[in-house]
Amino acid sequence: MSAFKKSLLVAGVAMILSNNVFADEGHGIVKFKGEVISAPCSIKPGDEDLTVNLGEVADTVLKSDQKSLAEPFTIHLQDCMLSQGGTTYSKAKVTFTTANTMTGQSDLLKNTKETEIGGATGVGVRILDSQSGEVTLGTPVVITFNNTNSYQELNFKARMESPSKDATPGNVYAQADYKIAYE
């Protein structure tokens, strides 16, 4: 093979390889977020912003029974150090609050989709404790830790309700904030 052909071959291979080096075959950005909190337990990633799917409930159920079946949800605590600095923690106090309650129903979360096109009316969302007792918004629910493990579960439920039995079909969305205190 002549020197010219060898040079041409080397140049061709170099061009092919250089195209792969400079070709953009996909790119993106990875963002990381978190927060350091002063507490004996960490909240499991993803549980700081939960979504509870209450499903599709027939309006006839809400008009007759006034309530849907309750759907469970859990706030998971991890990396718990329940004994530290002479203090032992045996309970979590979870307080739910909201700026939007149904008129005349201070413990029923308002459907904020109610005023939008396609929003259900006459429907709110009720938070329940693990035993299906109604949670009073703004009042702590005390949960005793079941052991001294570093992993704990705070179990609750939620359901749709129509106290006036006049629910209309449509989308339902409600929101509550929660805070955890330890004792």
From Swiss-Prot:
Q: Which family does it belong to?
A: Belongs to the fimbrial protein family.
SUPFAM superfamilies linked to this entry? Bacterial adhesins
Q: List the disulfide bonds.
A: C41-C80
Q: Which UniProt keywords apply?
A: Disulfide bond, Fimbrium, Signal
Cellular compartments annotated? Fimbrium
Q: Which InterPro entries match?
A: Adhesion_dom_fimbrial, Adhesion_dom_fimbrial_sf, Adhesion_dom_sf, Bact_Fimbrial_Adh_Pro
Q: Which GO terms describe its biological process?
A: cell adhesion involved in single-species biofilm formation
What's a GO cellular component annotated to this UniProt protein? pilus
Gene coding for it:
ygiL
The molecule here is called: Uncharacterized fimbrial-like protein YgiL
The residues the entry assigns to the signal sequence are: 1-23
**PANTHER family for the chain:** FIMBRIAL SUBUNIT ELFA-RELATED, FIMBRIAL-LIKE PROTEIN
